[in-house]
Amino acid sequence: MPEGSGEPRRGAQVNPNGSLRRVGAVVHPARPSAARLGKELADWAAELDIELRTLASERGCLGEDVPCAEPAEFPVGLDLVVALGGDGTLLRALGLVLAAEVPVLGVNAGRLGFLTEVEADGLPAALDAVRDGRYQVERRTTLAARVLLGGREVAEDLAVNDVVLEKSPRERLALVAVRLGDGGPFARYAADGIIVASPTGSTAYSFSAGGPIVSPRLDALLLTPIAPHMVFNRTLVLHPDEGVRLEVLPESPPLIEIVDGRAVRELPPGAVVEVRRGRHDALLVRVARADFYRLVRSKFRLADGAEQTG
């Protein structure tokens, strides 16, 4: 179906092989514009005899006739997922299908985002482009966070943007010991929290905390402290295979682990989180030439010198 071959690298690359037979939909449940797009997607799929599937919790967004599945079964056999909402909805969709390596098309039904590919009025053209194989798949580095309590692994969390250890609002400072790669102790951080971000996540919480914007084509991990109470307050940029080990120190209050904006668990003193590059890349569908820096310019209302001084 699509053209191109070879091993994809970071950035827009070759299309996946095979025809489009089964499509999944992830819909922002509280946004009427996303529900309207869901009905549009359902009509398109029915007209082309494409099997459409949604999550059981979002069945009403696409109509009662659309088959639904629980999260564990949702990605099985899918050729594509369409996320209807904003960047948060797209991150949720990617999290559902990350291990299955299903590409995701993000449709923006909210504010300008860095990840969604098309605006709401561009959905019909984008769906036709995907049907005809006129699209590419962009690979993004992901994160895998291994959580240990009492030296025993209790969970592994996958993230596209970031993994955050953060104190509760009323608690005193988070105290976290950091090791980098296979080396010894690097530093003890006293801060509101610590962010480990992918290049994709560099425009999210890490940026708000003072971190740099990093090209999504770069393989890297970013370590950014949140409001640090120490002289060293800069972001570290690491090779993704080096990894970061975060230990909640005994004198620290319990911290909250947040994965792609979702609070997933409380971490008591002594808990350890080891973050490395994920085994699976996030796969984003692109129907137009990706221009990351145009998005940065638009998001932050940047202008060239002539516009600023004129």
What are these regions (language model features)?
Residues L173, A187-F232:
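Gly/Ser/Thr-rich active-site loops/lids in small-molecule metabolic enzymes
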Residues A30, D87-T89, L112, T200-S202:
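Short glycine-rich anion-binding loops that position phosphate/pyrophosphate groups of nucleotides
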Residues H28, V82, G86, N108, ...:
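A residue-level signal for conserved active-site and pocket-lining positions in enzyme catalytic cores
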Residues P2-L80, L84, D121-Q136, V147-D157:
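ATP/NTP phosphate-donor binding region
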Residues L112-G193:
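Catalytic core of DAGKc-family lipid kinases
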Residues A34-A35, G88-A93, T203-S208:
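Short glycine/serine/threonine-rich phosphate/pyrophosphate-binding segments
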Residues L165, R170, G181-D182, F232-G310:
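ATP/nucleoside-binding phosphotransfer catalytic cores, i.e., glycine-rich phosphate-binding loops
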Residues A100-V118:
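Short, acidic/small-residue loops that bind anionic groups at enzyme active sites
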